[in-house]
Amino acid sequence: MATNIRKTHPLLKIVNHALIDLPAPSNISVWWNFGSLLGLCLIMQIITGLFLAMHYTADISMAFSSVIHISRDVNYGWLMRNIHAYGASFFFICIYLHIARGLYYGSYLNKEAWNIGVVLLFLLMATAFVGYVLPWGQMSFWGATVITNLLSAFPYIGNLLVQWIWGGFSVDNATLTRFFAFHFLLPFLILALSVIHILFLHETGANNPMGINSNTDKISFHPYFSYKDLFGFLIVITLLATLALFMPNLLGDAENFIPANPLVTPLHIQPEWYFLFAYAILRSIPNKLGGVLALLFSIFILLLVPLLHTSKLRSNIFRPLTQIFFWSLVTNAIILTWIGGQPVEQPFIMVGQIASVAYFSLFLFVIPITSWCENKFLSLN
């Protein structure tokens, strides 16, 4: 009898266990597609980024011109740039939906995979931030100046830390060079951590919408879920191509069409849309250090979610009260995103402060207490 090479070859065996013969719960829904979509986004970003890096010049006198050169003179350079820019937005859409699914269905109880996922989110945000600086437009320069300046809020070492990151006394050539180096390096670190993320996930197997043990009802990943994932790929690639080809500047800031000028400050300094919720939390606290700590905590609060799980049930599917507060959290995050893009004036300041308090309260108090109450209602002692 002929042996199947994918089941015996040392390398193919790993791929087989991860992508072909992987036992998957039969009832996982479309919300489980986003893991593979994140993989697609990462591969697309690395490939387009590699081609862009071949023509980009990390020097303040040439960076802006080199981006124009890519858009005008390089074969399909405009397409690579548009896909790379929109790819970042799609990456964040997918990761936020992936996290929301994890929160709703209790996937965070697989603590190792969840914690590595939070680290991946942080690395993705760092990569996107340093990447946004590279075109060296007005918003690139001032965004870099404002965000790196936040480190000066830390007592004693703050100013030293800022100058160390800048490589001088202001955002200058040294800053751009190192940001390019970080932007090139970090995606490969994300790729390595993604493999570890998948490794930990496959130790226990995927969660499912019911939040119960599904060992008695598993089907192979291929062909059932591989085709389902391909359908997701098709939708994302279609949307990405439509936006990149028909609306290339929809999400870009108009200020970034102006070369960086340290003497002229833009009217509203704001990051890309995917950072606005954290930026709104930062702005809602009048104290500089307090704002920076709140900004960091708005992301790292996800690490506390497994510790704050008080329910006897894993998934939210049978917990109507927790569902209400979960959707309140989603709405709250959308409100914070909107507030982050508004000028610093009333009533936006007050709305931002209320939404920031609600954001942390829902995570730390409201959802854990509601879950505990539901245990009592259902007599789950």
UniProtKB/Swiss-Prot annotation:
<dbReference type="InterPro" id="IPR005797">
    <property type="entry name" value="Cyt_b/b6_N"/>
</dbReference>
<keyword id="KW-0496">Mitochondrion</keyword>
<dbReference type="GO" id="GO:0008121">
    <property type="term" value="F:ubiquinol-cytochrome-c reductase activity"/>
</dbReference>
<dbReference type="GO" id="GO:0046872">
    <property type="term" value="F:metal ion binding"/>
</dbReference>
<feature type="transmembrane region" description="Helical">
    <location>
        <begin position="321"/>
        <end position="341"/>
    </location>
</feature>
<keyword id="KW-0830">Ubiquinone</keyword>
<feature type="binding site" description="axial binding residue">
    <location>
        <position position="183"/>
    </location>
    <ligand>
        <name>heme b b562</name>
    </ligand>
</feature>
<dbReference type="InterPro" id="IPR036150">
    <property type="entry name" value="Cyt_b/b6_C_sf"/>
</dbReference>
<dbReference type="InterPro" id="IPR048259">
    <property type="entry name" value="Cytochrome_b_N_euk/bac"/>
</dbReference>
<feature type="transmembrane region" description="Helical">
    <location>
        <begin position="78"/>
        <end position="99"/>
    </location>
</feature>
<keyword id="KW-0812">Transmembrane</keyword>
<comment type="subunit">
    <text>The cytochrome bc1 complex contains 3 respiratory subunits (MT-CYB, CYC1 and UQCRFS1), 2 core proteins (UQCRC1 and UQCRC2) and probably 6 low-molecular weight proteins.</text>
</comment>
<dbReference type="GO" id="GO:0045275">
    <property type="term" value="C:respiratory chain complex III"/>
</dbReference>
<dbReference type="InterPro" id="IPR030689">
    <property type="entry name" value="Cytochrome_b"/>
</dbReference>
<keyword id="KW-0813">Transport</keyword>
<feature type="transmembrane region" description="Helical">
    <location>
        <begin position="34"/>
        <end position="54"/>
    </location>
</feature>
<dbReference type="InterPro" id="IPR005798">
    <property type="entry name" value="Cyt_b/b6_C"/>
</dbReference>
<keyword id="KW-1133">Transmembrane helix</keyword>
<dbReference type="GO" id="GO:0006122">
    <property type="term" value="P:mitochondrial electron transport, ubiquinol to cytochrome c"/>
</dbReference>
<keyword id="KW-0408">Iron</keyword>
<dbReference type="Pfam" id="PF00032">
    <property type="entry name" value="Cytochrom_B_C"/>
</dbReference>
<keyword id="KW-0349">Heme</keyword>
<dbReference type="InterPro" id="IPR027387">
    <property type="entry name" value="Cytb/b6-like_sf"/>
</dbReference>
<keyword id="KW-0249">Electron transport</keyword>
<protein>
    <recommendedName>
        <fullName>Cytochrome b</fullName>
    </recommendedName>
</protein>
<comment type="function">
    <text>Component of the ubiquinol-cytochrome c reductase complex (complex III or cytochrome b-c1 complex) that is part of the mitochondrial respiratory chain. The b-c1 complex mediates electron transfer from ubiquinol to cytochrome c. Contributes to the generation of a proton gradient across the mitochondrial membrane that is then used for ATP synthesis.</text>
</comment>
<keyword id="KW-0479">Metal-binding</keyword>
<feature type="binding site" description="axial binding residue">
    <location>
        <position position="84"/>
    </location>
    <ligand>
        <name>heme b b562</name>
    </ligand>
</feature>
<keyword id="KW-0472">Membrane</keyword>
<comment type="similarity">
    <text>Belongs to the cytochrome b family.</text>
</comment>
<keyword id="KW-0999">Mitochondrion inner membrane</keyword>
<dbReference type="Pfam" id="PF00033">
    <property type="entry name" value="Cytochrome_B"/>
</dbReference>
<dbReference type="InterPro" id="IPR048260">
    <property type="entry name" value="Cytochrome_b_C_euk/bac"/>
</dbReference>
<feature type="transmembrane region" description="Helical">
    <location>
        <begin position="227"/>
        <end position="247"/>
    </location>
</feature>
<feature type="binding site" description="axial binding residue">
    <location>
        <position position="197"/>
    </location>
    <ligand>
        <name>heme b b566</name>
    </ligand>
</feature>
<feature type="binding site">
    <location>
        <position position="202"/>
    </location>
    <ligand>
        <name>a ubiquinone</name>
    </ligand>
</feature>
<feature type="binding site" description="axial binding residue">
    <location>
        <position position="98"/>
    </location>
    <ligand>
        <name>heme b b566</name>
    </ligand>
</feature>
<dbReference type="GO" id="GO:0005743">
    <property type="term" value="C:mitochondrial inner membrane"/>
</dbReference>
<keyword id="KW-0679">Respiratory chain</keyword>
<feature type="transmembrane region" description="Helical">
    <location>
        <begin position="289"/>
        <end position="309"/>
    </location>
</feature>
<feature type="transmembrane region" description="Helical">
    <location>
        <begin position="114"/>
        <end position="134"/>
    </location>
</feature>
<dbReference type="InterPro" id="IPR016174">
    <property type="entry name" value="Di-haem_cyt_TM"/>
</dbReference>
